[in-house]
C-alpha cells in the first residue's frame, strides 16, 4: 500500500514522496520528435516490467529493470521465478546491443552504456546465491553489502532481503 511504502521509506527524510500520483500505463510504442520508441518487455511473469528501445539511436531506457552502482530493488520480485524472468529480460536487452543505456536507478557519474545491464544481471545472480546461504534477512543484507560495498540505496538490499526471506510483505 502507499501508506506502507511511506513508512518503509521514512529513511528518505526530505526526499520522501509527499503525494500519490495516478499514472496511466503506456500500452504501445511511443513517438517523440519523429523518433519511435518501442515498448518492450512485459512477459507474463513480469507483466508490469517494460523498457523502451529506440533502434535508430540504439538507445535503451531501462526504467526499473536497470540499476547501476545501486543495490537492486528486488522487493517487487519476491520469488526466484520472478527474478529469473527479470534475468531473461536483461538477456533480451543485451541482445539488442544498445550503445546508450539509461538505467532507472544509478549513482551520478556512472556510465550510460550496456554495463548497467550486466551489473543488474550479475547482482540478481549474486542475490540468488547469497539468498540460498543466508539464514535470515539481516545476514542476506550483510552479504549483499559485503559484495557491493560501494553501491548506493542500501535500503533496497535491506527490504529485498526481508521480503525474500519471508520476514516482510511488500506491494
Identify what each model region corresponds to.
Residues 1-118, 122-129:
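Metallo-beta-lactamase
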Residues 1-11, 36, 95-100, 107-171:
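Accessory terminal helices/loops
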Residues 10-29, 52, 62-80, 155:
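Short, charge-rich amphipathic segments
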Residues 16-22, 28, 53, 101-102, ...:
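Short flexible/disordered coil segments
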